[in-house]
């Protein structure tokens, strides 16, 4: 189903291209952007694992994901101090990721905190961005790790209250000497640079969702204008209202 958009076909997934994903996300965005956001985050992490995870980890986790309809995944980048501070290319102590990872005795040890992570409060599998080389800038010194829920030293602390997209519950993650096997390293350094099509695809999906939300708002507005009367005529028959609706429709098509 829709949860399988980014899962490879050999695991029963759809492995759908970016354009088709955008069409699906736009339609879903008309109804509930929170549901759509949760869905696109699953798709984003699935596509990332398909591209970067070792084969044995894909063999372990994709079947679990496909068999469990409650299985959510999350992409952990945003932090309390720096937000999604991945655009800064200079190396300064106050800039970039504060979550650190060091290699020790055949394991990776993570320490830090993430917040506002979509799907985070309920997710069972996380892709975590961490600083592994403080001597270079963020684009060259960031690595990604696969962290299952329940890993010792990893805590999902709380859910954040939101005024919108409430179906997609975000959360805060804490890493306190979180110990990961060596093979749970997905991308060693330069993880930001290697996002490639995965990152672009995610942005396209978010944009398509916004178009869907706008289309839903336009549909509701046009329906109201057709059904309600003012000044002895349907609202849509007033020239200024019709002109505004036409302008909205034009902008929607331009966005699409």
Language-model-detected regions and their locations in the chain:
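Internal helix-loop-helix
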Residues: 2-72, 119-125, 211
């Amino acid at each position: 189903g829709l949860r399988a958009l980014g899962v490879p076909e050999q695991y029963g997934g759809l492995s759908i291209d970016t354009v088709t994903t955008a069409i699906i996300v736009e339609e879903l965005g008309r109804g509930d952007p929170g549901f759509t956001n949760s869905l696109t985050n699953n798709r984003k992490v699935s596509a990332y694992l398909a591209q970067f995870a070792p084969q044995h980890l894909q063999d372990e986790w994709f079947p679990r994901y496909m068999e469990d309809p409650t299985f959510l995944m999350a992409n952990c980048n945003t932090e309390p101090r720096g937000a999604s501070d991945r655009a800064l290319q200079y190396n300064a102590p106050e800039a970039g990721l504060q979550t650190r990872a060091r290699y020790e005795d055949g394991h990776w040890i993570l320490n830090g905190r993430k917040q506002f992570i979509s799907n985070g409060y309920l997710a069972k599998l996380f892709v975590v961005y961490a600083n592994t080389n403080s001597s270079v800038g963020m684009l060259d010194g960031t690595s990604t790790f696969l962290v299952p829920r329940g890993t010792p030293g990893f805590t999902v602390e709380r859910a954040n209250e939101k005024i919108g997209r409430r179906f997609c519950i975000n959360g805060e993650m804490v890493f306190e000497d979180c110990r990961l096997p060596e093979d749970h390293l997905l991308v060693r350094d330069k993880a930001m640079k290697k996002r490639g099509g995965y990152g672009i695809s995610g942005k396209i999906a978010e944009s398509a969702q916004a178009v869907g939300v706008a289309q839903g708002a336009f549909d509701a507005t046009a329906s109201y204008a057709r059904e309600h009367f003012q000044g002895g005529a349907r609202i849509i028959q007033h020239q200024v209202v019709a002109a505004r609706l036409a302008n909205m429709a034009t902008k929607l098509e331009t966005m699409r």
